[in-house]
């Protein structure tokens, strides 16, 4: 259907997908300019999952319908997948280390080209600056290379202690408790690049769960270049904190084929008591199950997740099975399809 602004389209705050805070989460008090996602029938809008967004008021006489699809990257980008003419990010009017880092990552490169401000200034901003200053500082420090790692690890430990109570709660930037914003010090470490992997492996035993979880996330973002971390990430699948287990199995899925040696332990996460760990486990196995590869040992547990209480978990289990060239997996998918044909909403009061 054609969607106009008075029909209550989705409203977004452009450029806020890396922001932990905005002026005010109350839409009536928000100072940032929003953008209404309007368009003719058939229009498709691609939106970063973490961008601040909300449903706008429908003041028209029409109902507004929407189809929402969630996309997840299944492998680390080894090279540009578009017509690529420039090596460096040059489209922004001002120096922006965050944009440069994302550009390099999409091009299959790690690290930043150069620091945009002195390290002393960036270190000060990392702890006490404004939201934008802290974000820029993280990626500026990431351009300082490995010499900055010990200092950044110290910042990470302090930041973990400071935000621990808030970050476990449902907050405006993490309304469902499943997608917390990364710590700024962790973003700085990730920007340095995978040459830090050996040093980080020694830090995965840190006594603070948020430090362990953050470093698992960092290693996973480095992709196959951090393949030496398989053993340590596998050990952390038995961690006492759900967030560490979740990030550890997610990281294994991102490391590529080398993580296949951890498949039995990854399969065990499909039985985890926390739905968020099960979700990450199903997605990680789906990432390993490239077309033409069978992970037959995972099939029985994936079949169990097909009836998981969480709809996303069910989807990722379907996805993992669909990526396997295996007759048992195919049969499980067909059985699930026929089961889905039964309507669970039919009652004596609503027969049809």
Task: Indicate residue ranges for each PLM-predicted region.
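Amphipathic alpha-helical scaffolding segments comprising HEAT/armadillo-like alpha-solenoid repeats
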Residues: 115-127, 144-171, 193-205, 224-238, ...
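Structural detector for internal amphipathic alpha-helices that build alpha-solenoid repeat scaffolds
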Residues: 96-114, 132-146, 166-194, 202, ...
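Glycine-rich, charged/polar anion/phosphate-binding loops
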Residues: 31-33, 51-54
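Conserved metal-binding segment of the jelly-roll/cupin
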Residues: 39-52
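Non-heme Fe(II)/2-oxoglutarate
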Residues: 52-124, 133-135, 139-141, 145, ...
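Terminal, low-structured helical/coil segments at or just beyond the last alpha-helical repeat
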Residues: 331-352
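Catalytic core of non-heme Fe(II) oxygenases with the double-stranded beta-helix
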Residues: 1-36
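Short helix/loop capping segments that flank catalytic or ligand/cofactor-binding pockets
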Residues: 6-8, 21-22, 48, 55-56, ...
